Amino acid sequence: MKYKLLIYGIMAAMAFCTTSCYSDFDEPAPAKVWTDADFTADGGEIITIKALKDMCAGVGLAQYKEITDNYIIKGKVISSDQAGNVYKSVYIDDGTAGIELKLMVSNYVYYQVGQTLYVKLKGLAIGNYRYMLSVGGIPSEKDIAKNYANRNLDTQVERDAHIFMGELGQLTEENLPVITRENYKTALTDEYLGRLVRFEGLTYKEGNFDGDRYPQYLETVYLNNATEATYTNKYFKDEGLTPTYAYNYQNQRYYGSSLFTYDATDETDKKGNLIVRVSGYANFALDALPQNGATGAITAIYTKYSSKSGGYI
């Protein structure tokens, strides 16, 4: 009984303090909403994401360019890691281009889809990893040894120094280009890499493309406590499994890849054959793939993975 009375007494004392000793801690000030003026007033220059990508066009694979000028980019958030398929990254788009920001947090909690983010680029590295440019920290020697072109902004201090939250908003048509069977040959270019794209009229196909067979998943194991993983392409049907977007069984989660096409008869058309690559951690990993030949639309981040094009849902 004394224990209960002690707890009640503490609660009463706390209640008294909060009612009689009001302070600013009770109602924290609203978070600052950053605007263009906050950066240009300090001599910063806001450039488009396309301009940033153009100035880094000569950066080779696994290489990076350090930004030494007081440049700032801004764009709306077009990705979310809530579904588990985008990991430690945020993609932003300003209507001219899109790019990945390499962060280290559960991003959907902090950055809302449609919200404007500002990025102070000075001191950051624009890296080229597997044909995709991204914004991150200067890579360490260990990163470079692993062919990483930059690194995640690991600490809150780093993120606070470079990432600034602007106003909430909505995505508009300029943030969501549309590709169709009629326009993909001319409209779908590398300028769409890193952008959220709606692909309409795609056909799901079980079959071959560019030397690979789909659908498949990438088994990733560390044999005999090795530090380097061994990767093996496996096929759902060969393993007696229903084809799904990814593999998630017995606490093992592997990437899955499936083929969607605008031209099912041409296995050499890289623009017309898109690989959808899904993490085994995605909350839709075990959703069944469509029936072979089914047609529909996919909204995805358009990326390259090595020399292949593909869409990350």
What function would you assign to each model-found segment?
Residues M1-L5, S23:
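Positively charged n-region of N-terminal signal peptides that target proteins for export
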Residues F16-S20:
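C-terminal motif of bacterial Sec signal peptides marking the signal peptidase cleavage site
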